[in-house]
């Protein structure tokens, strides 16, 4: 079986933990993860001033698609940048048309709203993004820590980053693999 592939789209102002933790968890599961810089391959300044070096520019990473999952980290400015990007819209529309998994955390799901993705799905966001996400009644809101509805997987925020990453692993590779990845992480049940 060919290995699964993930594209994490990294925008200026992204939440560091929501980028790095799911990326790490997916890589531990053997998923080939590409962290793509929205505006290029240069280091990206995140919401808490941590710099993350992308593996590729989004432009180059798109040429290597399709991916099994597209991941959108949160962070208010990061989510705004994802929401304003025509390239992100095109990638998400293509992923949705192929019924591929789309995963977004914290404020990241607001990019789904901005680009008209997954309307009718049950979603979760950071509590501060709930009102924006529910504007227009395009989604059903969940109070879960992680919510998967069809091919849309969403989560609350930095504190749910491990659960979010493990949910992506489970969706792509099954519960057994997710449990194997989880065990050595010493997470609180």
From Swiss-Prot:
Post-translational modification comment from the UniProt entry: Sumoylated on Lys-130; which is essential for cell-growth promoting activity and transforming activity. Undergoes cleavage of a C-terminal peptide and subsequent activation of protease activity in response to oxidative stress.
Sites bearing Cysteine sulfinic acid (-SO2H), chain numbering: 106
Q: Where's it mainly located?
A: membrane
Q: Which domain of life is it from?
A: Eukaryota
Q: Enumerate the active-site residues.
A: 106, 126
Question: Which membrane topology describes this protein?
Answer: Lipid-anchor
InterPro entries, from UniProt? Answer: Class_I_gatase-like (IPR029062), DJ-1 (IPR006287), DJ-1/PfpI (IPR002818), Prot/Nucl_acid_deglycase (IPR050325)
- The PTM Phosphotyrosine maps to 67
Is Nucleotide-binding tagged as a keyword? no
What's a single GO BP term from this record?
Answer: response to hydrogen peroxide
Going by the UniProt record, its keywords in alphabetical order are:
Acetylation, Autophagy, Cell membrane, Chaperone, Copper, Cytoplasm, Endoplasmic reticulum, Fertilization, Hydrolase, Inflammatory response, Isopeptide bond, Lipoprotein, Membrane, Mitochondrion, Nucleus, Oxidation, Palmitate, Phosphoprotein, Protease, RNA-binding, Stress response, Tumor suppressor, Ubl conjugation, Zymogen
One term of GO molecular function = oxidoreductase activity, acting on peroxide as acceptor
Reaction catalysed by this enzyme = N(omega)-(1-hydroxy-2-oxopropyl)-L-arginyl-[protein] + H2O = lactate + L-arginyl-[protein] + H(+); N(6)-(1-hydroxy-2-oxopropyl)-L-lysyl-[protein] + H2O = lactate + L-lysyl-[protein] + H(+); S-(1-hydroxy-2-oxopropyl)-L-cysteinyl-[protein] + H2O = lactate + L-cysteinyl-[protein] + H(+); N(omega)-(1-hydroxy-2-oxoethyl)-L-arginyl-[protein] + H2O = L-arginyl-[protein] + glycolate + H(+)
Q: Which EC class is this protein assigned?
A: hydrolase
- Which of the residues bear the PTM N6-acetyllysine? 148
Q: Transmembrane helix as a keyword?
A: no
- Which NCBIfam families does the record associate with it? not_thiJ
PANTHER family attached to this UniProt entry: PARKINSON DISEASE PROTEIN 7 HOMOLOG, PROTEIN/NUCLEIC ACID DEGLYCASE DJ-1-RELATED
Q: Assembly and partners?
A: Homodimer.
This molecule's function is given as: Protein and nucleotide deglycase that catalyzes the deglycation of the Maillard adducts formed between amino groups of proteins or nucleotides and reactive carbonyl groups of glyoxals. Thus, functions as a protein deglycase that repairs methylglyoxal- and glyoxal-glycated proteins, and releases repaired proteins and lactate or glycolate, respectively. Deglycates cysteine, arginine and lysine residues in proteins, and thus reactivates these proteins by reversing glycation by glyoxals.
Name of the protein in question = Protein/nucleic acid deglycase DJ-1
Recall the taxonomic lineage recorded for the source organism: Eukaryota, Metazoa, Chordata, Craniata, Vertebrata
């Amino acid at each position: 079986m060919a290995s699964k592939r993930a594209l994490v789209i990294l925008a200026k102002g992204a939440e560091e933990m929501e980028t790095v933790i799911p990326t790490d968890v997916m890589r531990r599961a053997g998923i080939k993860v590409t962290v793509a810089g929205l505006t290029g391959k240069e280091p990206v300044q995140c919401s808490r001033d941590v710099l993350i070096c992308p593996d590729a520019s989004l432009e180059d990473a798109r040429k290597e698609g399709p991916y099994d999952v597209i991941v959108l980290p949160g962070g208010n400015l990061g989510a705004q940048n994802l929401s304003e990007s025509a390239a992100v819209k095109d990638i998400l529309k293509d992923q949705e048309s192929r019924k591929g998994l789309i995963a977004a955390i914290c404020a990241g799901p607001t990019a789904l709203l901005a680009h008209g993705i997954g309307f009718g799905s049950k979603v979760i966001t950071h509590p501060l993004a709930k009102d924006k996400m529910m504007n227009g009644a395009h989604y059903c809101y969940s109070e879960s820590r992680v919510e998967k509805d069809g091919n849309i997987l969403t989560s609350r925020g930095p504190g749910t980053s491990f659960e979010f990453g493990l949910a992506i692993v489970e969706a792509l590779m099954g519960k057994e693999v997710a449990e194997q990845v989880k065990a050595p992480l010493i997470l609180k049940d």
